[in-house]
């Protein structure tokens, strides 16, 4: 019987795949002129995979790695969007210098043997 954190457990493999996908997306963004402000930022209300800035825009980016881009796109659920939005609010409290930027929620999709796909303005806050 394997321990939950063993190298062969599905959870560990998924975590490694996620770390790789986020790294790939950071490079993809940098090559397109984005400056990475933070990555893997956590607070009690949630986690933000990547925060990136270009010009007057601060993108809050959720990275999804799946076997194909379609299933990756479908995996950002409303509950997760709300958690990410709460985390973004908490982040901005720690970085008031970024509060004047236009806040945008993006998704980056990663699938094997394909470049990352960036979906800008993937959702908006309700209200």
Residue ranges and their predicted role:
Residues 48-72, 84:
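Conserved catalytic cores of phosphodiester-cleaving nucleases, focusing on short active-site segments
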Residues 40, 64, 106-108:
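Solvent-exposed beta-strand sheet faces enriched in polar/charged residues
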């Amino acid at each position: 019987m394997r321990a939950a954190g063993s190298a062969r457990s599905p959870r560990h493999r998924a975590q490694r795949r996620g770390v790789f996908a986020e790294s790939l997306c950071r490079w993809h963004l940098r090559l397109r002129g984005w400056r990475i402000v933070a990555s893997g930022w956590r607070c009690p209300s949630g986690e933000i995979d990547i925060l990136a800035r270009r010009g007057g825009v601060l993108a809050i980016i959720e990275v999804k790695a799946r076997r194909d881009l379609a299933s990756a796109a479908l995996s950002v659920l409303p509950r997760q969007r709300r958690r990410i939005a709460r985390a973004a609010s908490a982040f901005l409290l720690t970085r008031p210098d970024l509060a004047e930027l236009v806040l945008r929620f993006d998704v980056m999709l990663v699938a094997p043997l394909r470049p990352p796909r960036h979906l800008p303005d993937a959702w908006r806050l309700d209200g």
